């Protein structure tokens, strides 16, 4: 009788131990499955775009405007914007808190405080030497000046494109441009450029290599010059080296994260006629300009439309950078 009771108790204990082992095994198996599933989700989530079935609200949190359901890439939430302006803008506004005001206005367009940087430059000449286009998106405001029309046009060509440049020693060497993308870029306080094309015997064509007065003058007292001559022909150059430097440059393609906005002026500067601008796309906007506050209000109002036409830190050769005018 006691043997049967001991057997029953022993059987119960063995069953309890076996059940405990089975439960632990199931727990370990479920943990493995769950962790493996979560690992796969984490790996694949950056590669997938899911449909958003919620309501997208403006960053200000306003409930006044609801946008259609969609999966959107909110560029401004992870990007920086640099706004370059001439010194005269800050002088005219004459308000120590004007940048803070604009930052709050950019916030209403979805650009968080701290993502927009305001960079001042003295004049076109100093800006062209060292543009410092450091942000993901760069918008340059250029006040139209009839006396600097050529410099403005060439500055736009300079900063809207990527260039690879090397120094030139015009005292020792002749130079030729190999193709349409090859230009000579000169910068300085006053650049006067003269050229003398040479034949195969290195004799001047319509000029004397020993007399710079017979050279053909292609630029006079400009601050920025992009010189284009006949390809495949050697040239002897004369440059005002005391006030100007010249470089042999190759246009690599559009700098798609830069926009130039012309402020005011009756003439529209156009750089798309250059055969090296491919595709020849011109995008412009214009408002009646009176004061710098009006200019900045317009930029804030249209900033997202401008950004949509640009590419973030891109050097793609497939689409052109653009030139805006207000």
From Swiss-Prot:
| The entry's keywords | Calcium, Capsid protein, Disulfide bond, Glycoprotein, Host endoplasmic reticulum, Host-virus interaction, Metal-binding, Outer capsid protein, Signal, T=13 icosahedral capsid protein, Virion
- The region called CNP motif is annotated at 165-167
Per the similarity annotation, which family is this? Belongs to the rotavirus VP7 family.
Q: What else is known?
A: Some rotavirus strains are neuraminidase-sensitive and require sialic acid to attach to the cell surface. Some rotavirus strains are integrin-dependent. Some rotavirus strains depend on ganglioside for their entry into the host cell. Hsp70 also seems to be involved in the entry of some strains.
Domain of life of the organism encoding this protein: Viruses
Top-down, what is the taxonomic lineage of the species of origin? Viruses, Riboviria, Orthornavirae, Duplornaviricota, Resentoviricetes
Oligomer status and interactors: Homotrimer; disulfide-linked. 2 Ca(2+) ions bound at each subunit interface in the trimer hold the trimer together. Interacts with the intermediate capsid protein VP6. Interacts with the outer capsid protein VP5*. Interacts with host integrin heterodimer ITGAV/ITGB3.
The task this protein performs is described as: Calcium-binding protein that interacts with rotavirus cell receptors once the initial attachment by VP4 has been achieved. Rotavirus attachment and entry into the host cell probably involves multiple sequential contacts between the outer capsid proteins VP4 and VP7, and the cell receptors. Following entry into the host cell, low intracellular or intravesicular Ca(2+) concentration probably causes the calcium-stabilized VP7 trimers to dissociate from the virion. This step is probably necessary for the membrane-disrupting entry step and the release of VP4, which is locked onto the virion by VP7.
The record lists Ca(2+) 1 as bound by 95, 206, 214, 216
Cross-referenced InterPro entries, in alphabetical order? VP7, VP7_1, VP7_2
Calcium in keyword set: yes
Please give the residues the UniProt entry marks as glycosylated: 69
What are its GO biological-process terms?
A: receptor-mediated virion attachment to host cell
Region named GPR motif: 253-255
Molecular functions (GO terms): metal ion binding
Q: Where is this region: LVD motif?
A: 237-239
Give a yes or no for keyword Glycoprotein in this entry.
yes
PTM description: N-glycosylated.
Cysteines paired by S-S bonds:
82-135, 165-249, 191-244, 196-207
Provide GO CC annotations from the record. Answer: host cell endoplasmic reticulum lumen; T=13 icosahedral viral capsid; viral outer capsid
Q: Quote the record's binding site residues for Ca(2+) 2.
A: 177, 228-229, 231, 301
Q: Which HAMAP family match?
A: Rota_VP7, Rota_VP7_A
Name it: Outer capsid glycoprotein VP7
Where does the record say this protein resides?
Answer: Virion; Host endoplasmic reticulum lumen
Q: Which residues form the signal peptide?
A: 1-50
